């Protein structure tokens, strides 16, 4: 499969990440392998890269893309939050650098079929890890209006949070909201008319908030940051790069 996703600012990221060419590095969100490919090109034959991700389909693509590097690279289906357990299991105490590329890849947006995009008509899932947790449709169809409003405001600062939450609750009384397009159309017809045709799609912030909630993105980053000092070599870098919506 041809992979269209290109990592953002890859040269700048790799320049600061790789401080010791023969070191041990972690790509905590390998995705389809864009950053990992460049890391492997720039570390020495004695260097090692550990790749983590929870998206099963992305991992399969990364394994194919990075297979040329052989045993210099380990690809493991696990969250970066569990990096301490992963390192312990493979017998590594310290690493020289860690990369997190937070957010969605274009592959997930365009090809995953999990409802990340409000343009496509797909199941309203939004789980990065299809093997765990509640799908976005479960949140949309079961949370109270107050909780939905809070979620939209806290995770996306959606100015129309109350209107959208009320519309969701009213709509689901008629039947479940199970597709991304169904939800997007509901939001489009809910917000005031003069705000419906601006540059940013009216559903952008709602979809962002749901994705963050479904995947516990903020909680995961907070947990990870608490663990960093225990396995990062002194004075070396932890890089976190968030992709724009």
PLM regions and their residue ranges:
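S-adenosyl-L-methionine-dependent methyltransferase catalytic core, i.e., the SAM/SAH-binding region
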Residues: 1-245
């Amino acid at each position: 499969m041809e992979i269209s996703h290109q990592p953002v600012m890859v040269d700048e990221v790799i320049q600061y990440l790789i401080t010791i060419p023969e070191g041990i590095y972690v790509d905590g969100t390998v995705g389809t392998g864009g950053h990992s490919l460049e890391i492997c090109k720039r570390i020495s034959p004695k260097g090692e890269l550990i790749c983590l991700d929870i998206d099963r389909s992305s991992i399969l693509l990364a394994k194919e893309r990075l297979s040329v590097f052989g045993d210099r690279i380990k690809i493991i289906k696990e969250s970066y939050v569990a990096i301490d357990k992963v390192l312990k299991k493979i017998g590594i105490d310290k690493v020289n650098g860690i990369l997190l590329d937070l957010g969605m890849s274009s592959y997930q947006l365009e090809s995953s079929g999990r409802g990340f995009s409000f343009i496509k008509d797909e199941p309203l899932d939004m789980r990065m890890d299809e093997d765990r947790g509640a799908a976005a449709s479960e949140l949309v169809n079961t949370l109270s209006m107050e909780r939905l409003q809070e979620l939209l405001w806290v995770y996306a600062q959606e100015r129309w949070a109350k209107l959208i939450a009320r519309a969701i609750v009213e709509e689901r009384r008629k039947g479940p909201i199970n597709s991304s397009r169904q939800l997007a159309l509901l939001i489009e017809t809910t917000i005031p008319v003069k705000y419906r045709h601006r540059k940013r799609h009216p559903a952008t912030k709602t979809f962002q908030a749901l994705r963050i909630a479904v995947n516990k993105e903020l909680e995961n980053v907070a947990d990870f940051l608490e663990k960093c000092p225990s396995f990062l070599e002194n004075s070396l870098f932890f890089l976190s790069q968030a992709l724009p919506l």
